[in-house]
């Protein structure tokens, strides 16, 4: 039978636990928390953080003292600060349950005003980071009066929140300052009324607040902040009008004029990188970013990171033609999570993240894999991975091959220090070369293999140092003066060093230091920034390849060092004796009597969310989600309230996330219905209160990796149902109650890669088994197996094919029935109108972009996308005492199978994914509908 199925069945819907998709957040480490109280903070730490506790407390109190004076405001309660030893451990925090990418340096949340951060940074940067996050705590108290509900519902622009934090923390370095300098002189400064997001929001907002203080003083800046609080929705335009009596257009004009004045001197004296030599390009018309150049010994190829495929790859560029030659990491992989590429996948540090082997056959790069990082040796001839080495330290990056190719030097963090390590490629063993409190990074070998040059920072700035490999304690300082010096490399004859420095006007340029005469020459004078110079021999002589920031992105350029300008001499190398440390304004002594173990785990409101979904037959699905957590997010109580067309459902769960094995307990009360038809009259009826299930379960899941996890549950359900029977040609419902113990086990995998609009590549699947026992009759009440598999095949950057196969089968004394239809399961059919204990449906879609942004005076629509789809499904009822005859196809036509085809559109509207579908049912030969069945629904697609 086609369309509605015969309503002769028994319904049991076993509650499934943990069958949601998504990659895993793996808790690799165990954290035994302690607390240290200071006048304004409660600092949470564990054993690996304790050696740095005094430093953290001093930086935090110094930041509080400065901000309280500037803002003339006091935080009423001690501020929780949760410190992690490294970024790898910080990524395991459960304060935010979602995955945390390495590009996120730290965060603050309005729920209990918590600051969460890693401490594996140079002291000066750590102090700025703490102050940045502390500004957010002041914002939560000033703007939201410490109320979580207001924080979640007030829509203050990202540029305001992050720009204020950046400005009051004064955390901009020379790389960051290059962004607004480049945007201003390129006439790309947006309006404060625009929705500025991403990294640019930090830089743009920083300069807005700098402008406000420059024009109206600190009092004017405070007025701006408090007027923003006084607007009901956080509308910045109203705050600007109230604080400065300016409309947005006037404010924008004055702001842009002020910016141009700030950069007048730079614009007059500096230029585009092309003025110093030609650029490298992937191909004509392709906009991409490139960074971290490394030159092959032959001089014919340059390895670099590139984003031309909307991913971060390692590619080779031809030096003579300055064009893309080969992609070494083409395609998608699960052998690693991502390549370690500063400014692309991780935050900025020092130096380059690629290295060529002396024989030119191998390119070294670090990648994230599991808890830490691995060193990948890429095949420069054919692409792909030749070999990989696990790295025992955290945050490994910036590889450099020794001249004999037997070892690789790199920067890493361990024991509270950032040092240079040496990896033996034959044994896989590594040893610490620098082992000092300074922040050491960006190593490079001298051509004779006797020395190592690296960048080291103990106070405000990083300088170049040299150590003797035969005696690593024998070190000398090579560069001096203002600014940071980094990213060194040797000239081909070994007589000079090329490096990047921001010693002039705070702008990074490329310099050449003659190691014999100590004469210094500047090779570039760019508006943005120039980094990571490497020497290459061409037919025209020695050239220097480097990366430069211009027109909003990083690109590779080549310049002639002979055209450089002499800018003086460096002092003679000096032996390293004493290094000046970074000193905070306030020093806090760690007193053991103020340290206490964390014993209680009280819960508090952490998050609230609401969602709605609507289908074409008028069915309204609404949900409210409430989450309560302890201080560290490791113990949570989640409550889900749901309404399906007037039927209310409830589920509450306690979840323990403190270790890798995650477990929980849940209780629930669930009611639902489906659409059926009387087999004799054909009259459609909507069955009210078809079933109700009340019960509880214990569940657990164990992540085997980022991509795969095992799950299981056992529990008990009390069921109250209306059981359908046929008597005398009429359909009757008999009340039936059951007590059902059950077991469940499954596997879930997810390797999906996402674009901003949704999944783009990879696959996700779940396979699980449920066994429900018959407490009354004995044996098995229902035994079922489920498979939900989805595959995404990229066709281009924003085109993909999407496939889904769902299948479920059940048997037993009273097998479970499964229902689907409508939304994006089987379009052209009513919601939940297809039912059976043996079901399957298949969806195929081609998804493509239509309009990226549609800006109207009253509305901004984004990601307007289209699709063409085909749905095929089947459902059969095969119960004890009744078996529905079923034949999927007959003579090339669908008989009991179901199918539809059509097209649809999706758009993000007011932050919600909204969908329109136009479907026609067909039997593989003939269309069964005259016109399209139109559906409108809100929710997330597969």
Spans of model-derived segments:
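Juxtacatalytic substrate-recognition/specificity segment
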Residues: 19-157, 174-176, 193-194, 235-239
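Beta/coil-rich, acidic/histidine-enriched accessory regions frequently appended to metallopeptidases
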Residues: 22-37, 196, 228-355, 368
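Amphipathic alpha-helical substructures
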Residues: 73-75, 149, 156, 176-266
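Transmembrane beta-strand segments that form the barrel wall of outer-membrane beta-barrel proteins
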Residues: 221, 600-616, 622-645, 650-652, ...
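A flexible loop/linker signature enriched in serine peptidases of the S9 family
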Residues: 286-288, 305-315, 332-339, 344-349, ...
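Blade-terminus and WD-like Trp-Asp/Gly-His loop motifs, strongest in beta-propeller folds
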Residues: 293-301, 353-362, 399-407, 443-451, ...
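Outer-membrane beta-barrel initiation region
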Residues: 554-555, 560-664, 737-759, 838, ...
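C-terminal outer-membrane beta-barrel translocator/porin domains of Gram-negative envelope proteins
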Residues: 590-593, 665-672, 678-689, 696-699, ...
